[in-house]
Structure formats: C-alpha cells, structure tokens
Amino acid sequence: MARVINYGVALICLCLLGYQSLRAANTSNTEQIKWGTESILYEGNGLLGTFGGVLDGQIVLTGGTSADFSQWGRNAICLSGNVGFDLYEDILFRPLAYGTSIVLPDGILCIGGRDSHKCYREVFLITKQQGKLKISEDWPLLPIPLSNAAGVLLDNKVYIIGGRESIKPFKLSESFFVLDLSNKERGWRELPVCPGGVRENAICVVQNNGVSPCLYLIGGQTETEENSLSYLTDGYVYNPQLNRWSSLGSDFPKGLCAAISSGANHVLLFQKESGDTVQFKKENILWKYHTITQTLIKSEVIPYPYDIAKVLYRNQSFFIIGNDANFGTNKLYGLQGDIIPFKKGLGVVNILVIIGYFAVLAGIGIYFSRRQKNTNDYFKGGGRIPWWAAGLSLFGTALSAITFMAIPSKAYATNWSYVLFNIGILLVAPIIVSVFIPFFRKLNITTAYEYLEIRFNAFIRVICSMAFIIFQIGRMGVVLFLPSIALNVVTGLDIFLCIGIMGACSILYTMIGGIEAVVWTDAIQVIILLGGAIFAVVYISCSLPGGLGETIDIAVANGKFDLGTTNFNLKDATMWTVIIAACFTHLTTYGTDQSMVQRYLTTSSMKEARKSVWTNAILTVPATLIFFFIGTSLYAYYKVYPENLTISIPNGDAIFPWYIFTQLPIGVVGLLISGIFAAAMSTLSGSMNSAATAYIVDIYSRFLHKGDYGNELRAARIATCVIGIISLSFAFLMATWNIASLWDEFNKILGLILGSMGGLFMLGMLTKRANSSGAIIGIVVSIIVQLFVAKFQMFHLLLYTASGFISCFFVGYLASLFFKEKEV
C-alpha cells in the first residue's frame, strides 16, 4: 500500500511539473490589450447618435443624424462581422437620434431620443425574430422627454439619468428614473437625483464596489453661464441597496465618451478628446478606474483616430464603433480589442516546493497507517493525540481555502466589520468546555449524533447524521472547486488538475492514515498557513515607500479599520448583528459538527480536550487579525500601485492569490500556493474522516452490520475513499457544468436545515422535560421558520443560524410539554 501511495503522489507531482514547465515556456510577461485591424463597417449618411447594441452576436445600429443635423434616419443596419451588413429601411416610427440604448437578454431597449425640433418620451425594444429585426412599442413612456441621457441595466432594472429635456428652449435635466422589468406595468419611478446637477452625454456603467453592484456616473456636459456646453470631470456612484449617491471626486479626464466594466472591480474609460474642441486624429486614450481603491490611471493610447461613438461587448471582446462624419466622409469604423490575461509559469523552484509539501503529507499518511489496529485508532486516534495538536487541527479544519482567500478579500474591499465574527469563538468557548465536552466525554461516544439517540431516539440520530454527511460532501466539493478557480485564473493551473491533486492526495493520506494523519497534517498545514500569512503581511508593508506606517495611515484615512456601525439593525451587518451571529454560529459549529467534536474525542482526557478548545480559540484571535491585516495591506499597496492590479480576473476573492503570484519572490510563491492547498486540504481531510465516521458508527455498525466489528476498519477506509471520490466528482461536475450558483443554493438550503441542530443539542443538554416528539416538532418548525426568514429576508443572512437555533430550542421544549414521555 505504501509503495502504491508513493507512486501515486510522484505521478501527480510529475504531471504538475511537466504541465507547468511546458506552459512556462510560452507565456507573456504583462497583461495587455491586443488590438485588431481597423475596418470600415458602413458608408452612408446619418451616422451620429445612433441607437445600438449587440443582438444574437451581431451589432445593430438604428436611427442617427448627420453632422449638420439636416438628415435624420429611420433605418437600421445589422453588421455581420467586420464586413457586410443588412439594411432595414424605415424600421423606426419616426426619425430619431441621441437616445439611450440598453442591451437586455431578449433585445435592445431604446429610450427617448430627439429630432431637429424636440425630444421624445417613447420607449421601444428591438428584437430579432426569424432572422429579421422587429420593433416592439409596448413599453411605458418616460415621465418626461429625454435625449442624450445615460442608462444601464442593473438587477433586472433599467436606470436612466440626466439628459436633455428640450431643444428650444435648451434645457438639461437632472432626473433619475428606474423601470423594474419584472413589473414594467408599474411604469417609471423617480429616484433621488445625483448631487452633481444637470448633465447630458454622461457615461454610466455597472460595476461591483467590493460589496455589491453599483451604478457609476462619470463626466458628461453641462450648460455654462454663457449658454455653451462645458465638459464635466466629476463622478458619482449610486448604491441601489442603500438608495444613496456618493462622490468619486472631480479628477476624471475631459471628453470621456464610453465605458465598460472589466474584471471584478475595474471600469475601462474611453476618452476621445482632451479638450472642448474636436480635432481630426486627436489621440483616443484608454483609462482604468478601480472601484475599490478609487484610483485612475492612464492605460494606453488607442490606435484609432476617429470619434468614438460606442463601445460594445461582442464575443468576449469589446468592439469600438466610431465615425468621421464631422469631417464629411460619412464612414463607420470598427476596432476590436481583446484583453490578453497576464500569464506566467510557476517555475521549477515553486513547483519543487509544492512537490515537497505533497511528499510530506504522503509520508505522514504512510507512517500513521502502521499504528491502526481497529476503528478506535482510525476514528479517535486511540486517545493518543496531544491537546495542542488537537487544537491546531480544530483551527485548521475551521480555516478553509475559501476563508484563506475570502478574509483578506473582505478586508481589502470593505473594512474590519467581520473581524468580530471569527473572534466570537472566545465568547462560546466556555460553553463548549463546560457543557458539550463533559456530555461527549462521559458518554464515551464516537460521533456527536450517538448522543441524540441516547437522549431522544434512533430516528433523530440517523436523520441528523445523514444531513451532516450530505452537507460535508457538498462542502468538500466546493472547497475543492472554488480555490481551484482562483488558482486557475491567477496561475493558469488547470482547474481539473488542481482539483485532482488536492482531492487525490487528501483521499490517500486520510484513507490510510485515519484521524491521526488528519490531525498531524492539519498541524503542519496550520504552520504553513500562518507562516506564509505573517511573511505576506511583512512583505506587503515593506513594499510601500513608507513601510508599515504608510500602510496604517492609508488604512485609517480610508476607514479600513472600522468595525461597523453600532446601530441595532438586524437586517444589516452591524456590530451587534455580527456578535449575535458569531455566538450562535460558533456554538452550533463547535458543539454539534462531527468534524469538530471528533477532535475533542482524540485526546486522552477531558482536561486535554478542554485545552484543545482553548488552544483553537486563542489561536483564532491573532490569526484573524493577521488575515484581516493582509487585506488592509493589499488595499494600501494597490492604492499606491494601481498599475499592478489586473483587469481580467472576474472574482474579487482572487486578489490575495494574484498578489502572491505576481509580487512575491520565487520559492515563497510556492510556499503560499502550498498554503492555499493546505487550507483546502485541512478542511477536506477533516470533513472526509468525520463523514466516514458518521456513516460507519451511526449507520453501518448501528443498522447494517450490527456487531460485525472485525470488518469495521476495512469498511471505514472504504467509506472514506467512497465519500472522497463522490466529493471529488461533485467538484469536477461544478467545473464542467459551471454550476457554482447551484452550490450557493445547495449550501443555503442545507445551512438553513443544519441551523436547527445547535438548538436540538442544547434542548437535550439543558432541559429534562424535552422528549423525542417535541424535538422532531422543533426541527420541523425550525426548518419552516428558516425558509420563511430566508424568503422574506427578515434578518441579515448571518443570523440564519441564530433563528434556527432559537426556534428549534423553544418550539421543541414547548411541544415536549404536550407529550408524555419518560423524563431524562
């Protein structure tokens, strides 16, 4: 067996080395935009101010006017590729130009517009039916006539801002309207106006501010006292969740004409001129604006001298459409831009570090496989685990790779409002050591759910155990999948290879080494994690000219150390919400989760078990502060060096892996990537072993093969392997079918169900009159309450566990009073 394991790990590592070495030989050193060849798309009159968008992969333009406003169009053209077009004559009900175009899933929504005399309120949808363009006018009219307005689609709502109300007399608008597409019969609603005042020809784009998608309004033109138009350089952001505008400053360049979102938090701004005059072959410039650090940098000159009219997404690229109608030639030009992601191989040194890490894990599994004689050794380590190792294992199991990336990402994007959630373990540790551990140790049980049969009945035990097993399989799948996405995006490491390496190695050493291998590998992985994290904090801070002092100054100036508001609002992530959620979540996790409870049972005595809990609790405090400070340091670093940010990574959680891969020295990169592997695998191994334990003890030995102790160890290893393979397969399916959103729903539903488990255990431990009938009613009512709370969003999602806990406890106790069963 040991020789097979060695060969297996060696083969995996050689695949990794060969794949990355070949890939490293053909990579670019910088992220860049590859520009295509400029092409003439169309020749004709009326090319200014057209409605437009992408429909079924083709660019559709309709309406428009000439440079001298003497000709106004009703036609539409459908561009196929860079050459060729289909012309649809007189498709519009009237000549129109300078309206707002928004691409919807089923067509292009055209809003407002004008002709030579007036502005209009009409709204219509351009669709494609049987290969032909069709116009649908069954849409609510605007409250006021508008042209030259800015508009976007956000969360199935259409927003329209500013614009021109009338031509004679000339009048600009500061209006802000929204149309809910799910209830468009309600019509347009008015929202709080932008504090920047009236404007037209502003650019508007949707991008995530680090917390949620927001509406960004930048630039435009406004009327001066001399009755002329002047370019604006200010910007504002509207948060739909808060229904509030915030200023972005007034340092944006003049002449911005288009914008698109890129990556997780970037906005690409296209500038067609640098002043209030139009000059032929004026340089067009691409700017990058980052929504989290609120930094703006000049990226490059666009090899395109004509007036930029629109920038559209098409086939995963952006397509610039412009014209030279102001100079009398009446040609429509196109230019495609492709974002080429930053690519770099890991290199031999980093790969050797990662291989060394996997070799150590394999060695630990082989070593402890020789010490197992029965399932007591396999599941409880024969009581040989020292308290400090059990404490490190508790910490490692709780800290997954998702947490390893998500905590720095959260602090980088927002502040320290969630720091109290992790530190909340200190509040519940006294309850764990004084209530839960004495029950589990005195009963000499192997799984937490054995207690439920002793206290209530076998049905409750089996249901809770099966729910735990299913949850752990799903959890392992996502713990494999999500870090693999980040590593793939940042390093280019193949997702399937990444999932396979982590999954296969975890299955191997967990299957052959049992809980002892899990605990000791967890201990090593925690050392790698914290060592790498401490190095990252020091290295990031030293990268700034002012060192640690500058990091702190930038963080303080931008509110990055804020702990959240003290308002008692349970619908928002206030300080009180976080503290309450932390108490109930940690009480449920550390008191009822088999992967945690199993660690208490591996020590030699109750005193040792209690010390392991306090070790984990005390270790959580500095570790949490370190990981939050990593995020804060990343914010300060990218505030000073915004040019090192990437516009291609779509996931904000990848910011720490991005820094690791692009900025850290050779060798350290391998160590920190091993840290990501370590964070994932410590959770995987713990979940795998605890799920196998629950199956063997609560189902296999209890019902299927009762009294068959001779084959339990073999069955335990088979169960570990099967559960691991199912989880690995689930991760592969998520990668193949791109069903990350399915995990969100899966996790949400099972999380709502498991939220009642903490209340169930406390019901049994703290009351004598609670019985099995009342407990079952408590579980059912708790699930109903949870689903009701989730549907109507009565509380912040952090409080779902608390609502499940409380409802199960009180309903279960009250229901028990109506049933006569033997008191405990």
Predicted segments — roles?
Residues C13, A24-L346:
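Kelch-like beta-propeller repeat domains
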Residues M1, T30, F85, P105, ...:
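Intrinsic disorder/low-complexity signal
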